[in-house]
Amino acid sequence: MPSRFTKTRKHRGHVSAGKGRIGKHRKHPGGRGMAGGQHHHRINMDKYHPGYFGKVGMRYFHKQQAHFWKPVLNLDKLWTLIPEDKRDQYLKSASKETAPVIDTLAAGYGKILGKGRIPNVPVIVKARFVSKLAEEKIRAAGGVVELIA
């Protein structure tokens, strides 16, 4: 029956302790860890980890992330920014005097996209960026788009 661990005590007095003759069973012949990735282990790196070494593209120095902040909101979700208790009230009285003001920036959205439909009720939408299609759909419903900084 094979044993789980080698019995080191039994190897006492036997020079190579079951590891062969002179020079066999050396410590770390290929180096430790990722050593030799660009040298003697190159075939493995190229085959199983393509693209591990090297660079691609250009660096963007002093990139200001705030300039690229633009979370999007589609038109079909626009009315979810109005509280539910007031939503029915606005939908019933579809007049320009009582049009709801939707501030998308305060809700955490940077741009409005034109996917989906909106009810045929005038709304005043305040946003930083609005796509062409979204603006057309809001205007078709009798609404107004205000661009804010």
UniProtKB/Swiss-Prot annotation:
GO-annotated molecular function: RNA binding; structural constituent of ribosome
GO cellular component, one term: cytosolic large ribosomal subunit
Motif Nuclear localization signal positions after renumbering to this chain: 7-13, 24-30
SUPFAM superfamilies (alphabetical): Ribosomal proteins L15p and L18e
Biological processes per GO annotation: cytoplasmic translation
Keyword field: Cytoplasm, Isopeptide bond, Ribonucleoprotein, Ribosomal protein, Ubl conjugation
Region span, Disordered: 1-39
InterPro entries named among the record's database cross-references: Ribosomal_uL15, Ribosomal_uL15/eL18, Ribosomal_uL15/eL18_sf, Ribosomal_uL15_CS
Compositionally biased tracts (Basic residues): 1-14, 21-30
Linked residues for Glycyl lysine isopeptide (Lys-Gly) (interchain with G-Cter in ubiquitin): 96
Effect after changing residue 38 to E: Confers resistance to cycloheximide, an inhibitor of polypeptide elongation
HAMAP family named among the record's database cross-references: Ribosomal_uL15
Summary of the function given for this chain in its UniProt record: Component of the ribosome, a large ribonucleoprotein complex responsible for the synthesis of proteins in the cell. The small ribosomal subunit (SSU) binds messenger RNAs (mRNAs) and translates the encoded message by selecting cognate aminoacyl-transfer RNA (tRNA) molecules. The large subunit (LSU) contains the ribosomal catalytic site termed the peptidyl transferase center (PTC), which catalyzes the formation of peptide bonds, thereby polymerizing the amino acids delivered by tRNAs into a polypeptide chain.
Name of the featured protein: Large ribosomal subunit protein uL15
UniProt organism field: Saccharomyces cerevisiae (strain ATCC 204508 / S288c)
Source organism phylogeny: Eukaryota, Fungi, Dikarya, Ascomycota, Saccharomycotina
